[in-house]
Amino acid sequence: MDDFSSISLLSLAMLVGCYVSGIIPLAVNFSEEKLKLVTVLGAGLLCGTALAVIVPEGVHALYEEVLEAKHHDMGDIHKAKDAETGAEISAAHEHDHSNLHAYIGVSLVLGFVFMLLVDQIGSSHMHSADDPEAARAASSKITTTLGLVVHAAADGVALGAAASTSQTSVQLIVFVAIMLHKAPAAFGLVSFLMHAGLERNRIRKHLLVFALAAPVLSMLTYLGLSKSSKEALSEVNATGVAMLFSAGTFLYVATVHVLPEVGGMGHSHKPEVGATKGLSRLEVCALVLGCLIPLVLSIGHQH
């Protein structure tokens, strides 16, 4: 199968898988208590996915080429038995590794700061509304969706860059990594929007935009890359950088929007019953379970 057919199939699978997993909370009618529990589980899935799947996958993609090159060079050293050459090569690898460490931090921080700026710009436009609380809630819904769409778009670029390397194994690894977190993310996004009180038709539109972002960007990236730019991309390891940038956006959405929103849900329930602000024990268990599920899935998906 040629690269174009494989990237088309992977994009289609990504679109269908993401949309179907996002529809699940909409298809089932939850009571208010159960919806809260599902929302907390979704928040846990978003956080666990960011930390246990996306960051490690991005780091792995970044280091993969260097480790392979090092492996080949070590073989050459053993053949040559030349101590001086060996020292030079190991020094070059130390330099490579220090560069890669910088890439990791810069990509994560840029993703986080990018979403922070988008959030501030979005909320500054919203503050002119009469009801500041309603404006904040509306801004939160938009930012959450926008953050996940930006994240999905960066995923799409990563998959498109991986497809342009013509290595099926790299494509499949990136695809599996993306699917492992897109399904929980779609579930988390829809349950969060349901809790925020968005109408079902609008939730479906948000979900469709999120589901389309990665497939469309992966196709555009693959088709838009010329041969020379493909070589340049493989040199700077665009797949790893794009995944880490998307991890930064994902972390922002999970920690700054979804978690505080979920943590502050206690006050929306029967205020007279008592000051049960924060989460109940069952909700804490659901949150922890949500964080652990992506971890277990990622352990099962060994390279």
Curated annotation (Swiss-Prot):
Gene Ontology terms: biological process: bicellular tight junction assembly; intracellular zinc ion homeostasis; regulation of cellular response to testosterone stimulus; regulation of vascular endothelial cell proliferation; zinc ion transmembrane transport
One MF term in the entry's GO annotations: G protein-coupled receptor activity
Matches recorded under Pfam families: Zip
Keywords from the UniProt entry: Cell membrane, Cytoplasm, Glycoprotein, Golgi apparatus, Ion transport, Membrane, Mitochondrion, Nucleus, Transmembrane, Transmembrane helix, Transport, Zinc, Zinc transport
Reaction(s) this enzyme catalyzes, per UniProt: Zn(2+)(in) = Zn(2+)(out)
Topology in membrane: Multi-pass membrane protein
Transmembrane region(s): 7-27, 35-55, 102-122, 142-162, 172-192, 206-226, 240-260, 282-302
Location in or out of the cell: Golgi apparatus, trans-Golgi network membrane; Cell membrane; Cytoplasm, Perinuclear region; Mitochondrion
Recorded GO CC terms: mitochondrial membrane; mitochondrion; nucleus; perinuclear region of cytoplasm; plasma membrane; trans-Golgi network
Domain of life of the native organism: Eukaryota
Glycan-modified residues: N29, N237
Family classification: Belongs to the ZIP transporter (TC 2.A.5) family.
Functional description taken from the UniProt entry: Transports zinc ions across cell and organelle membranes into the cytoplasm and regulates intracellular zinc homeostasis. Participates in the zinc ions efflux out of the secretory compartments. Also functions as a membrane androgen receptor that mediates, through a G protein, the non-classical androgen signaling pathway, characterized by the activation of MAPK3/MAPK1 (Erk1/2) and transcription factors CREB1 or ATF1.
Protein name listed in UniProt: Zinc transporter ZIP9
Organism listed in the record: Xenopus tropicalis (Western clawed frog)
Annotated gene: slc39a9
